[in-house]
Amino acid sequence: MRERAVAACDGASKGNPGPAGWAWVVADASENPVRWEAGPLGKATNNIAELTALERLLASTDPDVPLEVRMDSQYAMKAVTTWLPGWKRNGWKTAAGKPVANRELVVRIDELLDGRSVEFRYVPAHQVDGDRLNDFADRAASQAAVVQEAAGSALGSPEPPPAPDVPAARRAPRRGSSGAARKGGGGSSARTIKAKFPGRCLCGRPYAAGEPIAKNDQGWGHPECRTVAAG
């Protein structure tokens, strides 16, 4: 059995549900990306994209090599580590007695995890000086969701493009009060609230519970993305 491999996976959905994609990346000993893959899902939810990314990663790596998987999706991690045993005992029903969502993907992941050493590690998304592998997987998944085409090292694809300058984008609303002037004018509201649950903005970046969000034409997301879309 060889030393542990380090990898990350991520999913993206532009609309939730909307055009979606998945991606995974495996690093070398210095945690530089050396092998990666991304693919389209058509129209799908964030959760389907996240689970698909994990399923593809597990299916594409050697089961005899211990694996560390870095993810920014609490749902996908808890689904296959915390909730899965109870779902199986309950005949694939939740504690509320409802059918488990995305059961086929969860079952497939459970099969791929059987008999292999996998450690899951949660990493916050889109942090300054955050996890490099998570950032790579996030960019690859987002690009796959947008272009709806497969990509990866085996295809000779270039690395996924960098994410937009988030700090600069968040400064944009300070230039004036144009956002407030749009309230009630048929567009998106300028009002912001704190998210009760984590989700993903139309830009493809996730937001955490408690983070300020605003209404846009496709749902809820970052206030700066609402401003950009309105402009």
Swiss-Prot record:
SUPFAM superfamilies: Ribonuclease H-like
Stated role: Endonuclease that specifically degrades the RNA of RNA-DNA hybrids.
Membrane-spanning residues: none
Biased composition (Low complexity): 148-157, 166-181
Cofactor note: Binds 1 Mg(2+) ion per subunit. May bind a second metal ion at a regulatory site, or after substrate binding.
HAMAP family listed in its UniProt record: RNase_H
Binding site for Mg(2+) 1: 10, 50, 72
Region (Disordered): 148-192, 212-231
Annotated GO CC locations: cytoplasm
Subunit structure comment from the entry: Monomer.
Organism, as annotated: Streptomyces coelicolor (strain ATCC BAA-471 / A3(2) / M145)
Domain of life: Bacteria
One GO biological process term: RNA catabolic process
Chief place where the protein resides: cytoplasm
UniProt cross-references to InterPro entries, sorted A to Z: RNase_H, RNaseH-like_sf, RNaseH_domain, RNaseH_sf, RNaseHI
Record family assignment: Belongs to the RNase H family.
UniProt-annotated binding residues for Mg(2+) 2: 10, 138
Name of the top EC class for this enzyme: hydrolase
Name of the featured protein: Ribonuclease HI
The keyword Metal-binding belongs to this UniProt entry's keyword annotation: yes
Sequence ranges assigned to domain RNase H type-1 in this UniProt record: 1-146
GO MF annotation, one: RNA-DNA hybrid ribonuclease activity
EC number: 3.1.26.4
This protein's UniProt keywords: Cytoplasm, Endonuclease, Hydrolase, Magnesium, Metal-binding, Nuclease
Catalytically driven reaction(s): Endonucleolytic cleavage to 5'-phosphomonoester
Subcellular location: Cytoplasm
Cofactor(s) needed by this chain: Mg(2+)
